[in-house]
């Protein structure tokens, strides 16, 4: 029975490259000359620091541009609150990996509502979709690509 997995993953290597490029751009931009502003990655969290809140917002734009250039969807980021004190402003950005249970149920419901001849089951942080024909699976992918979910979805592990 043909099947595929629906996942939401971020390529950590590309994420590291995008952060490095954003740091290089900060070093060369005129409005950030002589300013202690930087991006740091610790696992699935990106910490950004700058002297002011305004500069943090500019850094967000730089990071979004670099991520888009590297093929990483900005929907996979969750921006935390900006913490300010007299010396600097900080913000934590969390990178979302995997599909949460609540969103997986929404995806499964969307497939059911489309009345396709496929079955879906939730396996941890991914969703397996099975159908009798490959055409049914292609229709399911089209439905999921057209749907609006809070995460970017990727399709992998195709089996015949």
From Swiss-Prot:
Keywords: Nucleotide-binding. InterPro entries: DUF520, UPF0234-like_C, UPF0234_N, YajQ-like_sf. The keyword Nucleotide-binding applies. It comes from the Bacteria. SUPFAM superfamilies: YajQ-like. It holds the Pfam family DUF520. Transmembrane segments: none annotated. Belongs to the YajQ family. Nucleotide-binding protein. This is Nucleotide-binding protein Smal_3487.
């Amino acid at each position: 029975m043909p099947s595929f997995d629906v996942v939401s993953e971020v390529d950590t290597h590309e994420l590291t490259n995008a952060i490095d490029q954003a740091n290089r751009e900060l070093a060369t931009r005129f409005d950030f000359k002589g300013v202690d502003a930087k991006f740091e990655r610790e696992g699935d969290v990106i910490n950004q620091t700058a002297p002011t809140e305004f500069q943090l917002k500019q850094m967000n734009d730089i990071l979004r541009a670099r991520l888009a250039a590297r093929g990483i969807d900005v929907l996979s980021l969750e921006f935390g609150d900006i913490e300010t004190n007299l010396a600097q402003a900080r913000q934590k950005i969390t990178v979302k990996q995997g599909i949460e249970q609540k969103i997986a149920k929404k995806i499964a419901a969307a497939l059911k509502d489309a009345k396709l001849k496929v079955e879906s089951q939730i396996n941890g942080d991914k969703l397996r979709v099975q159908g009798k024909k490959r055409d049914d699976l292609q229709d399911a992918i089209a439905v999921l690509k057209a749907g609006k979910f809070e995460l970017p979805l990727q399709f992998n592990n195709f089996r015949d």
